[in-house]
Amino acid sequence: MSVFYPKASKTIVGHKAVREALRDTQTYSSDLQGDSDVRDYRQLPLEVDPPRHHLYRVALAPYFVKPSIELLIPEFRAHTEKLLTDFFKHESLEVGQHLSLPLVMKNLGVIYSRPQDVEEWISWGPDVWTAESEVRDGKVLHRYLDAIYEEALTKSKDDIWSQIAYLEIDGKQISAAEFRGIAGVMLAGGRDTVVKLFTGIMWHFGNKPEDLALLRSNPELIGPAIQEFLRFLTPLPAMNRTVVPESSTSELPDDRYVGISFISGNFDESVFENPFQINFHRGRNPHLSFGFGPHTCLGNHIAEIEAKVFLEALIDSGLTWEVTTEEIRFHQLPYTKIPDYFGALKIART
């Protein structure tokens, strides 16, 4: 989930330093609001510090625990197999638009019991802030959030929005703004990041089919492969913190933002041997793609289970493919071999 902030005055880099900063919420606070050009509310529980952060996290955790998500695997698998079959019926298609995005949205439809919304979510494209034009705008998302909030308050449907609308935090039912903040993260947090993960997997296997063959011969490597793809692709490369909590004062210096570089931790040579190589035999893999500390991603189990189903379906399909077109924006030095954004990726069956 990409969040827009003004430029950071400094950036914390390196695995050890990043982990220490993410633990130190008093010095590096999440009490800030990103995307101020398109929203006027906090994304929750992302943009609030402990102890209130913990209250939101405890209330939301039951929706994301691993046993609950594992019950949905058969539906994830059915969607994955159908989309793969349909995708490879064509000579060459764009992966993000025709495979990764639809699959991620269908999975979210299952998780949230909102299959009726999947086509609308897909229509937003990879970034909801640019759903209607290249200019960032919040109207599309906010129309949807306002509509589902009004619907949820009627308790007419048994879905996740009806439950979220009546959550209590510290003994009080959440407000409309809090609902926006929670639901917005739930729609965005597992959207562009997982789309990038799936697209990156297809890109890698298209360029290195021997790695797909390795997994077919050694399915016990699927778990390590998931963690290695998460590390290498680093779907969310950085986030900001603030050294001046924004709700505590009206005097907010322009240089209050500090960048936290997850990608620097994931390619730290003191932790990962040959970090610029994808290695499914890598043992310990303490990557930072889900963050670290109190704000560790709530949806990490969802992403891992989705990726496991995706890889298992690819392995069982017997398919192989090659990249026919790639328009990729890579990161700046020293990460110039690491995709930042897949503008277009077309593949063809071999």
Feature locations, PLM:
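Cytochrome P450
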Residues: M1-T350
